[in-house]
UniProtKB/Swiss-Prot annotation:
Database matches in PANTHER family: LD18447P, PEPTIDE CHAIN RELEASE FACTOR APG3, CHLOROPLASTIC
UniProt record similarity statement: Belongs to the prokaryotic/mitochondrial release factor family.
Main location: cytoplasm
The protein's name: Peptide chain release factor 1
Described purpose of this protein according to its UniProt entry: Peptide chain release factor 1 directs the termination of translation in response to the peptide chain termination codons UAG and UAA.
Top-level taxon of the source organism: Bacteria
Residues bearing PTM N5-methylglutamine: Q239
PROSITE patterns tied to this protein: RF_PROK_I
InterPro entries found in the cross-reference section: PCRF, Pep_chain_release_fac_I, Pep_chain_release_fac_I_sf, Prokaryotic/Mito_RF, RF-1
Entry annotated with the keyword Transmembrane: no
Source organism of the structure: Synechococcus sp. (strain WH7803)
Higher taxonomy: Bacteria, Bacillati, Cyanobacteriota, Cyanophyceae, Synechococcales
UniProt key word Protein biosynthesis: yes
Record keywords: Cytoplasm, Methylation, Protein biosynthesis
Length: 365
C-alpha cells in the first residue's frame, strides 16, 4: 500500500472513530441496546488502529527532530553518533508501525466477528474415526476455553464405542469465526487405535465445517418449507428416558437439510436450536456458492471453508501435526490439549500475506 493511500485510509478510520464516539454520547443511541452494542463494538475495533496512527504521527515527528539534530551535529562527532542511534531506533519503530497499520487496514471478512456452529463428522475409519471426532471436539472445547468463548453441544450422535458419528457445537464469543474458520476441512489422524491388538497404525479422518451464525434477515426460511416432528430424547432406559417428546426432527424440503436436536430440556428450546443450525447450514451453502463464483486465486487462500479440503495430518508416532496449507509442522500433544494459538496464528499470518499480495497486484495494475 503506497504511503498516500495508507494515510488517507487512516484519516478516514480516525474520522469514523470520532463519529462513533459522538454517537455513543447520543441519548437516542443509548436507549437502543442493539444499536448501542453495534456502535460500541465497531468503536472498540477501531480504537487500536487510531492509537497506532497517533503513535505513527508521534514517531514521524521525532524522526524529523532526530534528522535536524543529526544535521546540526556534523561538527560534533559524539553528538552525531547519538543522534544517528536515536534515528535508527525511530526508523525501526516507524517500520513496525507501518506494517501493523497496513495489516489492520486489509479488507476484513464481515463474518469474522460472528459466533459459529462447529460441525464435526466422523469420516473414514469406522469406530476409530468416531473416537477421533470426539478428540477433535475436546480440542476445540479446550481452545475455546482458553479464548474465553462459550461452547455448548447443540446436536450429537454418539457412537457405540465412544466418540461421535456427528456433533455440532455452538461456539459463542468475540471474533470466533476469524480464528476457527481455518479449521474447516478434513483432519486426518495416524495412530494405533485402542482397539488394535496388533499395534498397527491406522489412518482415520473427520470432517469439520465452520458455519458463521446467520441473522434471520440474511437467511429467510418459509414455514411452509419445513417438516417438523418430535420424539422422546434420552438414554437407554430408567431415569434417562424423557417421557415428554422434547427432541425435534426438522427437515427443510427445498435444500434437503435435516436437523435433529435433542440437547435442550424443552421442545421449544430444541426447535430454536434446530432453526439456528438450519439457518447456519443454509448460510454456509450461500457462501460456498459465492466462493465458487470467485477466482481460483481467491479459492486457493487459507481459510476458504471448503470442507472437502485435506488441511491437516495428526501423526501420533512422531508427535507431529502437519498443516498442509502452510507446509509446516507443530507439536501434536499441545495442539490436542487446545494450545492452538501457534497453528491458527500461522494461518492468520498466511491469510494476511495473501491479502497483501493481492493488494500489491491491484496497486501495480
Amino acid at each position: 500500500m503506497d504511503p498516500s493511500t495508507l494515510i488517507s485510509r487512516l484519516e478516514a478510520a480516525r474520522s469514523s472513530f470520532h463519529n462513533l464516539e459522538r454517537q455513543l454520547a447520543d441519548p437516542d443511541v443509548a436507549s437502543d441496546p442493539t444499536r448501542l452494542q453495534s456502535i460500541a463494538r465497531e468503536r472498540s475495533r477501531l480504537e487500536p488502529l487510531v492509537n497506532d496512527y497517533a503513535s505513527l504521527q508521534a514517531v514521524q515527528s521525532e524522526r524529523e527532530q532526530a534528522r535536524e539534530l543529526l544535521r546540526d551535529s556534523r561538527g560534533d562527532e559524539e553528538m552525531a553518533h547519538l543522534a544517528q542511534l536515536e534515528l535508527d531506533e525511530l526508523d525501526i519503530r516507524h517500520e513496525a508501525l507501518i506494517e501493523r497499520l497496513t495489516l489492520a487496514l486489509l479488507p476484513r471478512d464481515p463474518r469474522d466477528e460472528r459466533s459459529v456452529m462447529l460441525e464435526i463428522r466422523a469420516g473414514a475409519g469406522g469406530d476409530e474415526a468416531c473416537l477421533w471426532a470426539g478428540d477433535l471436539a475436546r480440542m476445540y472445547e479446550r481452545f475455546s476455553s482458553r479464548r474465553g468463548w462459550t461452547v455448548q453441544p447443540v446436536s450429537a450422535s454418539e457412537a457405540d464405542l465412544g466418540g461421535f458419528k456427528e456433533l455440532i457445537l455452538s461456539v459463542k464469543g468475540e471474533s470466533v469465526f476469524s480464528e476457527l474458520k481455518f479449521e474447516a476441512g478434513v483432519h486426518r489422524v495416524q495412530r494405533v487405535p485402542a482397539t488394535e491388538s496388533q499395534g498397527r497404525v491406522h489412518t482415520s479422518t473427520a470432517t469439520v465445517a465452520v458455519m458463521p451464525e446467520a441473522d434471520p434477515v440474511e437467511v429467510q426460511i418459509e414455514p411452509a418449507d419445513l417438516e417438523i416432528s418430535t420424539a422422546r430424547s434420552g438414554g437407554a432406559g430408567g431415569q434417562n428416558v424423557n417421557k415428554v417428546e422434547t427432541a425435534v426432527d426438522l427437515m427443510h424440503r427445498p435444500s434437503g437439510i435435516r436437523v435433529f436436536c435433542t440437547q435442550e430440556r424443552s421442545q421449544l428450546q430444541n426447535r430454536e436450536r434446530a432453526m439456528e443450525i438450519l439457518r447456519a447450514k443454509l448460510y454456509e451453502r450461500q457462501l460456498a456458492e459465492a466462493n465458487a463464483r470467485e477466482s481460483s486465486a481467491r479459492r486457493a487462500q487459507v481459510g476458504t471453508g471448503d470442507r472437502s479440503e485435506k488441511i491437516r495430518t495428526y501423526n501420533a508416532k512422531d508427535n507431529r501435526v502437519t498443516d498442509h496449507r502452510l507446509g509446516r509442522n507443530f507439536s501434536l500433544d499441545p495442539v490436542l490439549q487446545g494450545q492452538m494459538e501457534d497453528v491458527i496464528g500461522a494461518c492468520i499470518a498466511e491469510e494476511q500475506r495473501s491479502k497483501l499480495e493481492a493488494l500489491s497486484r491491484q496497486s501495480d495494475d
